[in-house]
């Protein structure tokens, strides 16, 4: 069901759109959690550390691909808000063509140099082979991952957040089955977990595209929609590439953090991996709000309804407090139990290290919520430069804290790097939005004054 977000109560629309996205994000985390749980329970702590050590590298590459996919969805939301269905179908056609090209460009070098990338991350010698077996398969499946995100981005661009959810639920069951079969029965080790994820993503992508074209006639492309239009390609990439670079820049900061954690040994790596998984699950309301605001702002910008943008962003600001509070409580109260889901009988040292990160992160969840809401909102408003630069600020904030705090404070100092990145970036994005808002209000007031003079 497509949803016009340019009419109706903004808070209600944002929440109704967000619920399926939240469930979808949780199932996306469920993919990763099932991989991690089964790897940790059946293959041991070293295998878990190996899979965990690839997380930031996956985020770097897949985040770039998925950022571009989200950018395509933003352009679809602009066309849908403007009620320009011919342009909308052209954006869909270009999205499909660019997905093929970009995924090929990303797949070849990452598969070829996966081991070298792990070496640059200071991956411990005892887990690097296991990590490489996992990440090579993930990189080989970039097309499947990007295709699903393009399909879901297009659907969300027209306000349909339910269809992507249905197929994620279906494919999550397949992922569980394949995890158990490929790891426990076939005994493919860490590679089996990667195969399960890629196959599940591929199934989800295929089904999503089939239903997308059958269910929504406005998305059904014809031969006339597939033509080379460099102007529109540039427009799509001008939105998609900053979003992609933002993911990648953030990922580089995470890689620096992961590299700093790796020097403390495989036990601490396993603890950090489990804690990061717990934090990701606890904070899923935040990227959910971000996705909703990108679509909401994109549609209303296309429709020229700036007052609705102001009201929606104000409502989202208040929702950030709820999201941050819920995430902090979950990390602090359920953290030990959730860490135990990822590591079978964790040692006291491992559990302590995991909870150290969660306690530090919980204090500063609110700035993290601001990042998702205001970064995605600004990107939906076709203001991609500052969100991209905010990623650079995240990178330097993490790096600076690691340089300053890692030696005197050890692992605790490294954990504080995320907090510094969230705080500085969240403030920058809020200030940027407020400046944009004041400029738009001033422009609208000037236009109204001119119209009154004419009358």
PLM feature segments, named:
Residues 48-108, 145-164, 271-335, 368-390:
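Small-residue-rich hydrophobic transmembrane alpha-helices
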Residues 16-35, 137, 148, 171, ...:
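Transmembrane helical elements of multi-pass membrane transporters/channels
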Residues 26, 30-48, 118-125, 181-188, ...:
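Helix-terminus/linker motif at the lipid-water interface of multi-pass membrane proteins
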Residues 69, 137-156, 164-172, 193-206, ...:
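Short runs within selected transmembrane alpha-helices of multi-pass transporters and secretion channels
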Residues 1-18, 76-141, 185-241, 297-364, ...:
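Short alpha-helical transmembrane segments in multi-pass integral membrane proteins
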Residues 39-59, 125-130, 190-191, 232-239, ...:
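Interfacial/gating helices of multi-pass transporter permease domains
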Residues 7, 11-30, 34, 57, ...:
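Residue-level signal for short hydrophobic patches within transmembrane helices
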Residues 60, 175-179, 205-209, 281-284, ...:
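Hydrophobic transmembrane alpha-helices of multi-pass small-molecule transporters
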């Amino acid at each position: 069901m497509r949803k016009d977000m340019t009419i109706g109560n903004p808070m209600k629309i944002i929440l109704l759109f967000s619920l399926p996205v939240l469930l979808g994000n949780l199932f996306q985390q469920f993919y990763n959690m099932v991989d991690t749980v089964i790897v940790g329970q059946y293959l041991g702590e070293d295998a878990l550390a190996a899979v965990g050590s690839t997380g930031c590298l996956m985020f770097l590459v897949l985040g770039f691909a998925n950022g571009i996919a989200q950018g395509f969805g933003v352009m679809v939301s602009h066309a849908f808000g403007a009620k320009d269905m011919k342009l909308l179908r052209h954006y869909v056609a270009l999205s499909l063509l660019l997905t093929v090209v970009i995924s090929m460009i990303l797949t070849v070098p990452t598969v070829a140099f996966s081991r070298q990338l792990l070496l640059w991350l200071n991956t411990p010698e005892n887990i690097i082979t296991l990590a490489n077996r996992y990440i090579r398969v993930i990189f080989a499946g970039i097309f499947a991952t990007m295709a699903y995100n393009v399909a879901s981005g297009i659907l969300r661009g027209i306000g349909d957040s339910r269809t992507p959810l249905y197929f994620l639920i279906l494919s999550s069951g397949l992922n569980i089955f394949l995890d158990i079969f490929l790891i426990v029965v076939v005994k493919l080790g860490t590679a089996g977990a990667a195969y399960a994820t890629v196959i599940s993503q591929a199934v989800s992508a295929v089904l999503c595209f089939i239903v997308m074209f059958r269910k929504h006639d406005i998305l059904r492309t014809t031969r006339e929609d597939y033509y080379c239009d460099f102007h529109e390609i540039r427009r799509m990439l001008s939105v998609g590439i900053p979003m992609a670079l933002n993911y990648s820049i953030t990922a580089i900061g995470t890689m620096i953090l992961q590299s700093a954690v790796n020097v403390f040994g495989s036990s601490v790596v396993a603890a950090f991996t489990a804690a990061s998984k717990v934090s990701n699950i606890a904070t899923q309301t935040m990227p959910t709000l971000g996705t909703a605001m990108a679509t909401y702002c994109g549609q209303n910008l296309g429709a020229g309804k700036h007052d609705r943008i102001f009201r929606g962003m104000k409502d989202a600001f208040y929702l950030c407090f709820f999201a941050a509070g819920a995430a902090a409580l979950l990390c602090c109260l359920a953290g030990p139990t959730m860490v135990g889901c990822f590591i079978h009988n964790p040692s006291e040292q491992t559990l302590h290290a995991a909870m150290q990160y969660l306690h530090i992160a919980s204090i500063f969840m609110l700035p993290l919520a601001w990042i998702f809401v205001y970064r995605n909102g600004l990107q939906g408003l076709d203001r991609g430069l500052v969100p991209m630069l905010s990623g650079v600020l995240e990178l330097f904030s993490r790096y600076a804290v690691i340089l300053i705090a890692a030696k005197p404070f050890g692992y605790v100092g490294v954990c504080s790097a995320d907090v510094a990145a969230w705080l500085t970036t969240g403030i920058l994005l809020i200030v940027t939005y407020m400046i944009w808002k004041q400029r738009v209000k001033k422009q609208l007031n000037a236009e109204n004054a001119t119209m009154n003079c004419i009358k």
